[in-house]
């Protein structure tokens, strides 16, 4: 049977013409009618005991291909009608027609029989001839009572030959074929007959559903989808049946690639069952495949909130179980919602472990709750149950995702604790998780660690594939292990000798190893290979339009070979004249590209075709920078050469594959020319200040502008690479201003991209270059002052060590004695160093802030005290010292708590005295901080007085008669909103709802 084609058996019978019914019956025929009626009456009384004649249908029942309703033809509507009409004589029919005609003559509207106001009678609803009715009754008797399926089948075939619109005959014919066994041929013939019956009665949704299940069993997927569509369009009155049909159709579509249609079906079901986990699972799997997690995240969030309100996971079907939670976590992982993912895994798995009430774990910034080492779970309010391993067992899939989330937020030590558990699992079980970890390390460019996990995966032979070898080759290439990288790419080419990506990487490896002839040959072969492919495609589809793939992809193979006018130079001549001509062309081409950049820059300023102009600008700039970086003379030292090689192996995503190949072939041509006839005259370039008739300043501006534009389009890591490479170029390194501005540009890029981890490198350079200058410490605090991620970068362990070494250097210089672990004093460009003449309170205070952020209150108090001793009249020092004492007093293991609170308020009131005389804004700030301090230790009745004083100075109190504009602070620095909110919380906790409502109405509702 052909899956999607026509049905020859059905078509041949459909084309049969219906025989004319006999007009007159003689007495013998009337006797036969009576005999057949008796047979039908007996058949109707057949009990369920006679089911043995129907054969063994258990196998079909298990497959969902048999139901009692389908086989109970003696009680069907069609047969019932035929049985009733079989006992009616022609005279009765004629009398009824005569009466109807009389009514019509008398002016009454003629009754339409059996249609209840509907249109014309369909072929299937027309009564068959009496001859057909008699044959059908006899076939029923043979099938049901005698179990003579062969004779019943012959009669059914004869009925179909006489009148192919009899549904019951088609159904019986299909049933006869099915009773012959579960063989494929029998089921196919059964399906043919039932499909014909279903088309005769398109509203029979149950029959369409049966045909769909049979089609699925025969792997006729398109036909099964068609039958499900017809069952749904039949609009069954029972909503549960409609949902069943849509569910089966959606599952079928999902399993066979029609993901969009499957998603539409599941979304329809989700409207009536928003918390059904089975529907959510299927939708999650679909959107994970098409990389569109955001389409379903909202529905998962709604369902999660609904189930999470229970103290423990409910029991039943279609509930939010651990696999559903894992899919929810996978969606958050794909959408890069790292903080939400961490929170979901911690709370979700805790809920499934029966520990929902242990919310105190959320107070910790790490994942000690799931540590294999039980000692990290020990803390002051821990109970004996915290040593129960099963209650604190984190499933491996969740541990992998949690580790990746920690890795992406810059918490490398915490991530490694999770990965160490996965790393010790057998590779045949954990290779999928190991691969995800390795890819995560590649994303943050820790290729050494990524390679470590890729090597582990190689121990499991079934996991080895082209993707694994390619990623390993990229890691080896970035780590400058060219021999291993070449082996990986050659392994790919053994399996797939036309793999473009492996060939390109192999060419890059040869280029970096100065084997330019081999690299040029590989690139030329790629051009030839792609030209042959394109010519073959043009021959096969001359009239088809081919989509142009703009932008680079990981594996691209559909782009046309560029018709570059210098493509002919793939095998350049070695003559001096041609080398000179090539150099002239490169110079002219470079100037042309710079001119094109100027034109595009003007277009960007006018905001004309911004997207197209920007992509073109980035592509041209990328080619120019590649051209600059390919000059080895510009990167003499080994460190600078590594930066150059690193940029050469990273191609911007704005350059297409064709552009990459063209750029590479031009570089190789240029390099081969210089190799044979001498490299560029670096002294001449430095003396004249021009390279390819373009000033060094213009090249410098290109690097800076390119990095800034990359940052604006979201490629901040590539911007860092470009700037790092520029820092290694000798043309820029000799100029102090250019060298410093490149660092400032990197800091600007990190600030624009809100990348605090990226800002740490230029900030440490600022500390080193401008030692013992207070503005550097203020800049550090200002850059890392926004949000949670900045806060984590602020307390980075490397920063702590760096600042501690600076403090030790300051102590060493001030005491004239050697201090172990001190930093090195850096000299300025004039050869002199900045030596402090006194202790710097800002540096000590900054380190105290880092200790306080880590909740290390005793070290924080020590450094705050040093800052206080240096400058006792600094308000921020007094405030910080007072708060540190209060926080230390509130810790569980604190000794002499009341004395520490007294010390804390001593410094806080000193801060108040220093601040209150500086102005109304400063006074309001001091009042608010005192109120917050009392609120923090639980003395709320004292806090109320200070909060009310803050509100008295707020511009929001202008309605009061006692308040004038001269006695209020500026709205820019007003603390009234914060004070009102805290005051409202106090009133609510104390049960004074009336006052809380008054505060909200006056200060919090706008």
From Swiss-Prot:
Major place of residence: nucleus
Coiled coil: 506-554
Positions of region (Disordered): 64-91
Keywords: Coiled coil, DNA-binding, Nucleus, Phosphoprotein, Repeat, TPR repeat, Transcription, Transcription regulation
Biased composition (Acidic residues): 66-80
SUPFAM superfamilies to which the protein is assigned, alphabetical: TPR-like
A GO BP annotation: transcription by RNA polymerase III
One Gene Ontology CC term in the entry: nucleus
A Pfam short name: TPR_8
PTM text: Phosphorylated.
DNA-binding in keyword set: yes
PANTHER family: GENERAL TRANSCRIPTION FACTOR 3C POLYPEPTIDE 3, TRANSCRIPTION INITIATION FACTOR IIIC TFIIIC , POLYPEPTIDE 3-RELATED
Protein role: TFIIIC mediates tRNA and 5S RNA gene activation by binding to intragenic promoter elements. Upstream of the transcription start site, TFIIIC assembles the initiation complex TFIIIB-TFIIIC-tDNA, which is sufficient for RNA polymerase III recruitment and function. Part of the tauA domain of TFIIIC that binds boxA DNA promoter sites of tRNA and similar genes. Sfc4 is the TFIIIB assembling subunit of TFIIIC.
Descriptive protein name: Transcription factor tau subunit sfc4
Source organism of the structure: Schizosaccharomyces pombe (strain 972 / ATCC 24843)
Name of the coding gene: sfc4
């Amino acid at each position: 049977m052909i899956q999607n084609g026509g049905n020859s058996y059905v078509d041949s019978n459909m084309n049969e013409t219906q025989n004319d019914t006999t007009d007159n019956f003689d007495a013998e025929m009337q006797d036969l009618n009576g005999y057949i009626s008796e047979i039908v009456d007996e058949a109707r009384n057949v009990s369920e005991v006679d089911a043995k004649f129907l054969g063994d249908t258990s196998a079909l029942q298990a497959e969902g291909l048999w139901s009692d309703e389908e086989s109970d033809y003696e009680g069907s509507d069609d047969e019932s009608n035929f049985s009733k009409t079989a006992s009616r004589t022609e005279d009765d029919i004629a009398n009824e027609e005569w009466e109807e005609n009389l009514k019509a003559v008398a002016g009454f509207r003629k009754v339409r029989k059996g249609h209840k106001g509907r249109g014309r009678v369909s072929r299937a609803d027309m009564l068959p001839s009496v001859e057909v009715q008699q044959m059908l009754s006899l076939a029923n008797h043979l099938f049901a009572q005698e179990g003579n399926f062969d004779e019943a089948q012959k009669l059914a075939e004869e009925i179909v030959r006489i009148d192919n619109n009899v549904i019951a005959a088609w159904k019986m014919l299909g049933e006869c074929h099915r009773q012959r066994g579960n063989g494929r041929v029998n089921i196919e013939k059964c399906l043919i007959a039932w499909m014909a019956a279903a088309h005769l009665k398109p509203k029979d949704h149950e029959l369409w559903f049966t045909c769909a299940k049979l089609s699925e069993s025969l792997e006729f997927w398109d036909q099964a989808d068609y039958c499900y569509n017809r069952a749904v369009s039949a609009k069954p009155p029972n909503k549960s049946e409609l949902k069943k049909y849509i569910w089966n159709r959606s599952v079928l579509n999902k399993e066979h690639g029609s993901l969009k249609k499957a998603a539409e079906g599941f979304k329809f079901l989700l409207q009536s069952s928003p918390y059904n986990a089975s529907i959510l699972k299927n939708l999650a799997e679909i959107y994970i495949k098409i990389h569109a997690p955001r389409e379903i995240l909202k529905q998962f969030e709604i369902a999660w909130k609904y189930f999470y309100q229970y103290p423990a996971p409910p029991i039943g079907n279609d509930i939010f179980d651990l696999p559903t939670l894992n899919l929810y976590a996978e969606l958050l992982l794909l959408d890069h919602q790292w903080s939400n993912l961490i929170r979901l895994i911690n709370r979700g798995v805790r809920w499934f472990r029966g520990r929902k009430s242990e919310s105190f774990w959320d107070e910790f910034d790490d994942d000690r709750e799931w540590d294999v080492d039980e000692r990290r779970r020990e803390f002051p309010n821990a109970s004996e149950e915290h040593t129960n391993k099963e209650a604190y067992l984190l499933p491996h899939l969740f541990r992998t995702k949690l580790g990746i989330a920690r890795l992406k937020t810059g918490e490398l030590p915490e991530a490694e604790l999770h990965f160490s558990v996965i790393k010790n699992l057998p590779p045949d079980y954990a290779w999928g998780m190991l691969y995800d970890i390795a890819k995560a390390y590649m994303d943050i460019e820790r290729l050494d660690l990524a390679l470590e996990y890729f090597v582990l995966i190689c121990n499991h032979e079934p996991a080895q594939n082209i993707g694994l070898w390619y990623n390993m080759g990229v890691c080896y290439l970035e780590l400058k292990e060219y021999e291993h990288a070449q082996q990986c790419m050659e392994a790919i080419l053994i399996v797939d000798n036309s793999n473009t990506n492996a060939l390109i990487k192999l060419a890059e490896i040869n280029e970096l190893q100065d084997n330019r002839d081999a690299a040029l040959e590989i690139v030329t072969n790629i051009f030839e290979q792609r030209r042959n492919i394109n010519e073959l495609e043009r021959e096969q589809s001359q009239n088809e339009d081919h989509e142009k793939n703009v932008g680079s992809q990981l594996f691209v193979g559909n782009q046309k070979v560029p018709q570059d006018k210098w493509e002919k130079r793939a095998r350049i001549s070695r003559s001096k004249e041609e080398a000179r001509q090539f150099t002239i062309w490169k110079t002219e081409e470079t100037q042309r590209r710079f001119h094109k950049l100027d034109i595009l820059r003007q277009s960007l300023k006018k905001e004309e075709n911004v997207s197209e102009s920007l992509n073109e600008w980035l592509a041209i700039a990328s080619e120019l920078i590649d051209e600059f970086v390919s000059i080895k003379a510009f990167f003499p030292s080994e460190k600078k050469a590594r930066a150059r090689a690193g940029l050469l192996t990273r191609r911007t995503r704005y350059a297409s594959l064709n552009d990459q190949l063209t750029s590479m072939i031009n570089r190789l041509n240029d390099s081969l020319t210089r190799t044979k006839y001498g490299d560029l005259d670096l002294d001449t370039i430095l003396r004249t200040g021009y390279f390819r008739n373009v000033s060094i300043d213009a090249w410098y501006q290109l690097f800076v502008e390119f990095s800034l534009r990359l940052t604006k389009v979201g490629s901040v890591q590539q911007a860092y690479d470009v700037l790092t490479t520029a820092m290694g170029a000798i043309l820029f390194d000799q100029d102090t201003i250019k060298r410093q501005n490149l660092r400032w540009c990197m800091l600007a890029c990190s600030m624009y991209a809100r990348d605090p981890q990226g800002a740490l490198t230029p900030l440490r350079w600022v500390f080193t270059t401008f030692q013992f200058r207070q503005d550097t410490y203020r800049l550090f605090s200002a850059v890392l002052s926004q949000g949670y991620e900045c806060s984590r970068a602020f307390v980075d362990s490397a920063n702590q060590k760096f600042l501690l070494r600076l403090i030790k250097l300051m102590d060493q210089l001030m005491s004239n004695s050697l201090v172990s672990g001190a930093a090195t004093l850096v000299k300025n460009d004039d050869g002199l160093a900045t030596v402090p003449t006194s202790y710097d309170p800002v540096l000590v205070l900054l380190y105290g802030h880092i200790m306080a952020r880590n909740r290390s209150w005793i070290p924080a108090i020590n450094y705050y005290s040093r800052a206080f001793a240096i400058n006792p009249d600094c308000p921020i020092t007094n405030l910080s010292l007072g708060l540190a004492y209060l926080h230390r007093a509130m810790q569980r293991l604190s000794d002499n708590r009341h004395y520490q609170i007294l010390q804390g308020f001593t410094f806080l009131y000193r801060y108040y005295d220093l601040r209150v005389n500086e102005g109304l804004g400063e006074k309001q700030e001091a009042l608010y901080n005192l109120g917050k301090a009392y609120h923090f230790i639980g003395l709320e009745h004292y806090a109320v007085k200070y909060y009310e004083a803050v509100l008295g100075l707020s511009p929001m109190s202008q309605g009061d008669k006692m308040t004038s504009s001269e006695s209020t602070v500026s709205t820019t620095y007003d603390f009234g909103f914060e004070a009102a909110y805290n005051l409202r919380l106090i009133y609510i906790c104390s049960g004074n709802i009336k006052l809380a409502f008054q505060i909200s109405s006056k200060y919090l509702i706008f």
